Every structure is written in structure tokens, then in C-alpha cells.
């Protein structure tokens, strides 16, 4: 891995703890519209930040952490087991398979798949239903707080564990091999070191 790239990585907060917690604790409802590919943290950020996730028919997700020799971040290890169950979460995190939009809805990781041309308008309309005068903003904020606040300590701990793992893995031969293999467009040959 290039030294100038490694110099940009803050080893103290690779999992983006502060960012993830800030998004998760946002009082106002947040809606996400995914209109194409969402790889790794791009999707897990939506899990942390969004109250509702809507997908274009063209959207898909890949969680390539293990294929790169790194650990999941942005709370992936916190959210996925709670949303999917432990074994399904492990399957998604261990194997970098492409997950199409309909499968994401079936798994409970998104709310709906929409025609690409209708995605943003639908998401906007749903957002308008959550704010005054159509939505009871105080009620929604109170319910969101009641659902999220008990989880903050656990999420914080999971992010600490992700940071610890990422700090070690970024110095590993497997990480270097994962990145090199991706750049060279070949399958990685991990050594476990």
C-alpha cells in the first residue's frame, strides 16, 4: 500500500466512531435513497444514519471487507447481527457477494425497491410525511430517541472493537495482499499474517 495513502488514515478512528455515532444519534428522521452500487461503508453508513432506506431497481451492495483483508467498519458488526441474526450477518461480512436490491428488502436491510426514475421523488414524499405539517415531528423524534438511546453504548463499544481490529489489520500482510490483488484484478492469496 502506498505510504501517502496510509498517511491519510487516522489509525485512532478508522471505523469512523465519531461520525457513525453522530449519524446514529441524529434526532431528526433521515431517509436514504440508494440509486446504484453501495460498497462497504457506503451501505453501512446508510444503516447507521437512515431511518428508512429506499433502493433503485439498479441498486446493489457488496461488503468486501474480508476480501480486502480488513475488518468491517461504521458499525457493520453492530447493525448487521441485530438486523439479520448472527449467522446471516457473518455470511454477508465474510463473503463479498453482490446483493441485489430485492434481496436487501427481503433481508430487512431496506424498505422498498423502486423504479430508478421514481426513487428520489418517492424518498422525498416519504420524508415530507415525517415533518410538520404532515408528520408529528416531536412524536417521531421521541420514538427515534427511545429506540436509539439504549443502543448507543453498545454501538460505541462495537466501534471501539472495529477500530482495534482495523488498526491491527491495516498493518498486516493480508491487508497489503488484499489491496494489491484488487489493484491487479486478481484473487488474493492470504497468508493469515
Regions found by a protein language model. Give the residues of each.
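CoA-thioester-processing core
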Residues: 19-25, 33, 39-93, 122-127
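A general structural signal for well-ordered alpha-helical segments in protein cores
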Residues: 16, 77, 86-89, 120, ...
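Structural motif
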Residues: 48-49, 107-108, 185
Amino acid at each position: 500500500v502506498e505510504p501517502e495513502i496510509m498517511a491519510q488514515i487516522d489509525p485512532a478512528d478508522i471505523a469512523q466512531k465519531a461520525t457513525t455515532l453522530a449519524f446514529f444519534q441524529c434526532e431528526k428522521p433521515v431517509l436514504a435513497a440508494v440509486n446504484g452500487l453501495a460498497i462497504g461503508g457506503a451501505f453501512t453508513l446508510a444503516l447507521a444514519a437512515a431511518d428508512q432506506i429506499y433502493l433503485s431497481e439498479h441498486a446493489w451492495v457488496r461488503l468486501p471487507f474480508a476480501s480486502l483483508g480488513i475488518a468491517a467498519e461504521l458499525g457493520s458488526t453492530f447493525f448487521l447481527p441485530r438486523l439479520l441474526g448472527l449467522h446471516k450477518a457473518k455470511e454477508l461480512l465474510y463473503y463479498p457477494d453482490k446483493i441485489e436490491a430485492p434481496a436487501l428488502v427481503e433481508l430487512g436491510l431496506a424498505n422498498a425497491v423502486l423504479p430508478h426514475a421514481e426513487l428520489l421523488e418517492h424518498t422525498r414524499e416519504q420524508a415530507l410525511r415525517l415533518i410538520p405539517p404532515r408528520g408529528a415531528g416531536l412524536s417521531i423524534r421521541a420514538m427515534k430517541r427511545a429506540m436509539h438511546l439504549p443502543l448507543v453504548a453498545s454501538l460505541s463499544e462495537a466501534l471501539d472493537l472495529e477500530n482495534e481490529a482495523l488498526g491491527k489489520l491495516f498493518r498486516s500482510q493480508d491487508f497489503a495482499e488484499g489491496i494489491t490483488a484488487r489493484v491487479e484484478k486478481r484473487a488474493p492469496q492470504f497468508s493469515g499474517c
